[in-house]
Amino acid sequence: MTQYSFPWNDVNGDRLYDADDFMRFFAAFLKTGVVMSYKGGLRVRSAQNGMNIQVGSGSAVIEGSSYLNDADIGIQVNVASSIQDRVDSVVLRMDKNARTTQLFYKPGDTTVARNDTTYELQLASISVKTNATQITDADITDMRSDFTVCGWSTPFDNINVDGIVDQYKEIFEQKDLEFQAWFQN
């Protein structure tokens, strides 16, 4: 596809759009990640109740696809091992085959899946100590700001302002020359 424009009204069945078209459109100006400024920003915290955590309300964008959660969601952490510590994670998973984006708890797994059909954002990692009976906020590491596994959704990403800066410098230099000529006279 060399050039593409979207959307256009249908005339005799020549314009059919699907989710991929809309995702491509939104991905052009919304970076994949959690929307920091919406509600609780999908922050993972201890539920202060045994082996339970909760994911706060919030929103995210994954490759142009939107996710919205308007209430806290509770997750029960698996029973701690009596032999060794383990690290679990909470991810937001977009599954194109299932046509869903949902929260998932991954016991003993801190990897993120990213392929043609699945894309995960790791919201938090949870340290489950040997024989633990409660998860505290100190056991939870917020991963939302780590752009290698999650990141923040923004409309801005490395904006190139070189042309504007060059233009400003040229104007400044011209005005400086005009001022110097005026000042000497």
State each model region's role.
Residues 1-62:
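N-terminal "first-domain core" detector
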